[in-house]
Amino acid sequence: MAQLPGAASGSPAQKPPLPQQIILSEAKARFDAAANAEIGLVERLVWFWSNHFCVSADKDVAMVGAYEREAIRPHVLGRFADLLQAVESHPAMLLYLDNVQSMGADSIAGINQDKGLNENLARETLELHTLGVRSGYSQADVTNFAKVLTGWTWLRPEEPVHGGEFVFVRRFHEPGDQVVLGKRYTEVPALKAAIRVFSQSYSAARWTDLRPWRRSAIRIGSPARRQCVDVGWQAAGA
């Protein structure tokens, strides 16, 4: 039998690195769940929302499977606001869109370091995750929401206290109130409040609620029926 160059005769196959083992295990679990699902719609929704709220394996390959399992799957049959909160606060999303390094220019950490605001998560949340393109938000809204997001980060697992958790680090946070889409947000509670407002907006309903139905070959049909979907979305608290 032909032998690979440099391979020792009779030597056992080497295991892939641990991150690759994790992603292979997560992928197998994902496909097994889809293959054995009694109701296929749930798996279709998991795949749809994982694509809508996509992250990259380039930043941390070992987190991708956990992200879908922890942030997406538990919420596909629940409120969009809860799904959005879980997604935007997951370590995989914070790493992917660089919010772990974002800090306000006037924050304690920002004044003392040559680092500053990162708008990636704020822009993606408004443009792709909730309101959609050409929905009326401005660059000022993106910048101010990025300031709201400062301080919300993830501590690496080796940290002795709260390691691996989504936490608020005040020394990174831009002080003061921020106005986003005409609404004023005050300091620390602003993140959850802003996400709730975005998720319940008419633009978010139009941008996100119809997409799963289009994917599943169910046609919304008339504008009146489409309006019913939008109204139902908002009445349910998104």
Q: What are these regions, as identified by a protein language model?
A:
Residues P5-A13, M63-A238:
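Active-site substrate-binding loop specific to GH73 endo-beta-N-acetylglucosaminidase modules
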Residues M1-H75, S107:
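N-terminal accessory alpha/beta regions
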